[in-house]
Amino acid sequence: MTDLGEATTIDGPVSDAPPDVVLLDRRIEPAELRRLAERFEDMVKYVVDVERRLVAIGGEMHVDGEQLLLDAGSRQADLWGANYHPGRGREACIEYTSFINIRPSAGNRSMELTDPALRERIRAITFALVGEGEPL
């Protein structure tokens, strides 16, 4: 797994985020992940700041997490959306698909993130802060 270095610490509330979107700078508790995953039964949407190593997880749309991270000082260019599927194991738990990933100016012309290096960074941050596909 890629070395994550020092994670950014967030002190106090960042914005008026919906209660079903959580900003992570450390590993999420399994009970909290279970609560967030209830919306879609077996999946939770999340957005990763690949530079600050933060995750905004939960919500109905990726844009909810994107906005929370922007409010916390993230840069748009560093934010990428994905879906986490608990119980699918390490190789199948991350789906690198989101409307916020459509960025022709960054070389990504579809909802699916295609850059292998970015995918690996997201994978490492996901495994550190969210999980590795373990069942809830």
Segment roles from a protein language model:
Residues 24-68:
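Negatively charged, low-complexity tracts enriched in Asp/Glu with abundant Ser/Thr
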Residues 86, 90-113:
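Intrinsically disordered, low-complexity regulatory segments enriched in Ser/Thr/Pro
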Residues 28-36, 104-115:
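Short histidine-centered catalytic/ligand-binding loop motif
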Residues 43, 47-50, 94-96, 122, ...:
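Generic structural hydrophobic/aromatic packing signal, biased to beta-strands
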Residues 111-136:
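Well-ordered alpha/beta subsegment
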Residues 42, 74-76, 88, 114, ...:
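Generic, well-ordered alpha-helical segments
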Residues 60-91:
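Amphipathic, interaction-prone secondary-structure segments
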Residues 2-39:
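Short, charged, low-complexity amphipathic alpha-helix
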